[in-house]
Amino acid sequence: MSYKVVVVGATGNVGREILNILDEREFPIAEIAALASRKSLGTEVSFGDKTLKTNDLASFDFAGWDMALFAVGSEATKEYAPKAAAAGCIVIDNSSLYRYDPEVPLIVPEVNADAIFECHKKNIIANPNCSTAQMVVALKPLHDRAKIKRVVVSTYQSVSGAGKEGIDELWDQTKSIYNPVDNKPPTKFTKQIAFNVIPHIDVFLDSGDTKEEWKMVAETKKIIDSE
């Protein structure tokens, strides 16, 4: 059996990597569509030996397509994911929008694959934060043997999590360290990121935690306790 697959946000770093993985793993695809915003319309992306031209997300008809892999921000997901789901297309969302929705399963296949059957409520499956996904794979067998009460974890995350702007800022600052004439102050991050570690991802909450820290707690509980 093969599937008709849509990749939403195909011109972004994550969207391009999704296309690469689908090809590398020889996912059974009958037809594939690459979608992007109007400003990226017509941009070409690679899919194996093929080149795909991006279509306009705003005008795309999801009817008749089996699944849509969303690799865009929460705002675009909020607008278009329900339309895709209503058209009968299973949405797999990489943003944080649906992660905490009680009617949307938050899936890490190695941990709670059976929870996927709950996706019929909204036709949407959520993908967790990358740090959460790695952590719960290690925690699950321990939790099964002896219920975990507390976890102390440190994560060190790449600037790619901040998108292309984060990657560009790291590159520019790294160059400026070796060529001080071309010194560029931070704009994407609160401090210099080159050769540095900043204990600040996303916004600070009233509790004093960052939203990234809160995400890991909430997502871990939802994934491990989904059974």
Predicted segments, located by residue:
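Oxyanion-binding "anion nests"
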Residues: 193-227
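N-terminal Rossmann-like NAD(P) cofactor-binding subdomain of oxidoreductases
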Residues: 1-193, 208, 226
